[in-house]
Every structure is written in structure tokens, then in C-alpha cells.
Amino acid sequence: MILPILVMPYVYRKLSPNSIGMIEYGTSLFTYFSIFGMLGIYNYGIREISRVRNVQSEVNRVFNALFSIGILSNLCVAIGYYLLVLFAVHDTTLKTILFLLGINLMANIFNIEWFNEANEEFKFITIKSIIVRCLSVLAIFLLIENNNDTYLYVIITVIVLLINNIVSFIYAKKRLVIQFSFQSFTKVITPLLWILVLNNTFILYGNLDKTFLGIYAGEAEVAYYSVANKIMTAIYTSVMVLMYVSYPKLSFYAQNDYVSYKRELSKMVRYTSFLVMPISVFLYMLSKEIILLFAGEQYIGTIQPLRFFAIYMIITSFTSIFNHQVMLINRREKKTVLFCLICGIINSIGLLIFRDTLNSSLVILITTLSECILVGLMAFYAYKKMGILSEVFAFCNLKYLILSLAFIPIILLIKYVFINSVIVLLLSILICILFYFIMLYSCKDFILQQIGLVEQKNVAI
């Protein structure tokens, strides 16, 4: 989280909104091909390796099948991708960006982080990610000087991804006997295709948003959307890391001890609510100060989109929980695909209806409403078929939202007294965090008990 916050303000001040918008528009187009290249290997790989990781022969079998399929799929997609870019894209800048981004399809071949995650190699993943990102930050600060370095910026991001994947591959290789094999092809291809469809239905949300903005609203609106999205994502990813870390354990419990699975799921949701609720209110109330500090005045059009993304963060956190921790873990991919497809179509229809008046804020609003419907569908299914509802929508988690909403008058008062954006930002964060923890401490909150700040009791509030 810290490194993107350090480097992104620098990039946004060196590259214009139009350049950032063109990069993001190109990335949205490339993503459609990247998903087909990776199929559903990442999610499927974590789930299956987690289940067989104590049996080395099975680990080798699953890994080799997925790795071999990944090589073949990425090579086939790369051929089709470059042919389309060569003959179908006429804008010179966009074509160059797309050619450079296509290298990521080769990087995808070595993207076996799912194996390391399934084996809970989080220390290695963390150290490697920090080192690679530090090198990325160094390269950007040394090489990116002005708007003429747009292509160079894309090259740096591509090389960083390639290095990251190769290092992970070398580390994982020590624990494997790697062979090019399609022996288990028929066994894994069906669930892979289901997850592929699932991934494709999810691009009917965020990725389609940028595509529509690029076509109907122009590069500047894509940039405003993308800057707000990157700020939200940088924070959201750090918060939701708990969900990804818990995936292997929950996957094991779901198959062997369902009571423990539901208990751990409830705990994970509680931690998520503890963090997501206050951060979302911070983002909404301090959007202007964050944008001025983070991106500068040329991105002032990002303030309103960031406010909508602050609301969206709460909704999408529950989408992720139901999708990854409930539906996929319990092998309900088909239902997830159906629900995502329904809501993705709703989102697409909304974008089409308002295409002539689209802007970054309206796009986020349409997507947020679509995801609300998606959460409702998955929650209803989880309750009816798996007996899961209170584990996710526990009443005790509501206090995190209520306490977070109390930040609003505090921040408004600080803004009334102080004008300087940095002072407003720092004071708001400091005072609100202090208020939040004092209130939670006074009611002996479960999370504070878990981290040792409050003496544990038999019944947690």
C-alpha cells in the first residue's frame, strides 16, 4: 500500500490526464485477452493445491496440468491479440501501448503465485513483492521525467510484472518436478472453463466501465475514473489481504470441518468490517484533500468519482467475500457465474442507456447498484443452500459502520477550522482513529480482544 501511494502522485504529476487515460483504456482492452490467457488457473490452482498439498505426487500432477494449459492458452491468445492490434487498431499511440502490454501475456506463463499462496508462503510473497516494487519505484523516479515518457512508463510496468512472475516461478520450482503434461486435462478443463466464464462476467463491471468511458467520454474521464479506482484499490487490496490469506485455511475447513469453516468465516468478515467501514468514510469525506495531495489540481475531476468509489468499496468487499470465501470455496462456481452474468448484463444495459451522458461518477454509480443486486443474489443463495448469512451479515458488525459515520461531523468541524489540505487530512485521521479505538475499547470489542488490546471475555460484543 505504501509504495503505490509514494509513486503514483509522482506519475500523475509527470503524465497528463490524457496520457493516463490512454494507458488505462489500453489496459482495459488488454485485460479481455489476459483473462482468456490465464483461464481460471489462479483461483482453481489455489483451491486444488490447498486440498492436496500434503501429497506431493498429487501436487505435481495438479501443478503440471495447470502450468501446461497456461502455456498453451497464453501462446494462443498472444497470437490472436497481436493480429487484432496490428490490423484493427488505428490510433498510433494506443497501438504502441497495446503492443507493449501484450508482453504481459508471456509474463502470465510464469504467473504461478497461486502455488505459493496455496502453500501459505506469505513471507516469501511479501518480501519478493516489496523488493520488486522498490525497484519499480526507483526506475520510475529515475526515468520518468515528463509526458513524453508515456511509453517508457508502460515498459517499466511490463518488465516489473515479468520479473515478479519469474522470481515466483524460480522459488516454486524447488518444490516441484515440472513436466509438460496434459494427462489431467479432461479433469481440470471443465472447472477452469467455469472460472473463465466467471472472470469474464466480472469484466462486465470495472473493465467494461473503462472501455465505455474510453469510447463515449474520452481519455480524461478514463483518467479520472482510473485515478480514483487506483486510490481505492491500493487501500482496498491492503485491507482485503486478510481475505486472501485466509483462503487456504477456509478451503480446508469447508471440506473437513464445516462448523470451524463458518466460525473462521465470521471472524474474517468481522476483521474486514472493522477496517473497511472507517476507511470508506475517510475516503468519502477527505476525497478533495486526498486528490490534491495525491494527484494534483489537474486531476480535480477525480474528487467526485473517489466519493462514489468510497461507497463502492463497502459493497465490493462483500462481493469478494461471497464470491471467494463462500461460493468458490464450496464449489458453487456455476451459480456464481449465473449471478454475475445477470448483474453484469444489468450493468452493461445501464451503461448503454446512459452512454451519451456518461462520466466517471455515473459509471461508478451504475456499477455499484449492479453489485448491490449481485450481493443480494449470492446472500440469498448462501442462506438457502448453505445456511450462511449471519456469518457475513452479523448485527455486531453494524457498530463499525455506526462509529465510522460519527467521523462525518468530526471531519466537517476540522474542515471548518482549518483550510490547509495536509493539516485537515492529518488531523482528521488522527482524531477519528483515536475516537474509533476509544469507543471500541469502551465496549471491549472482539477485534481488540483478538489483538490483545482488551482482556478477552467469554462473550464478545
Show where each model-derived region lies.
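Signature of the first transmembrane helix
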Residues: M1-N43, A78, V137, T190-E219, ...
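Alpha-helical transmembrane segments of polytopic membrane transporters and translocases
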Residues: P9-Y10, G21-M38, W194, D209-T211, ...
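Interfacial segments at transmembrane-helix termini and the short loops linking adjacent helices
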Residues: P17-S19, L84-L101, L283-I314
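Hydrophobic alpha-helical transmembrane segments
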Residues: Y25, G102, T126-K174, T190-P191, ...
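Helix-loop junctions and terminal segments of transmembrane helices
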Residues: G37-N54, M232-V269, S273-V276, N323-I329
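Interhelical loop/hinge segments that connect adjacent transmembrane helices in multipass membrane
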Residues: K123-T126, T150-T157, I166-G206, T211, ...
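Membrane-proximal transmembrane or re-entrant/amphipathic helices at the cytosolic face
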Residues: I388, A394-N397, P409-I461
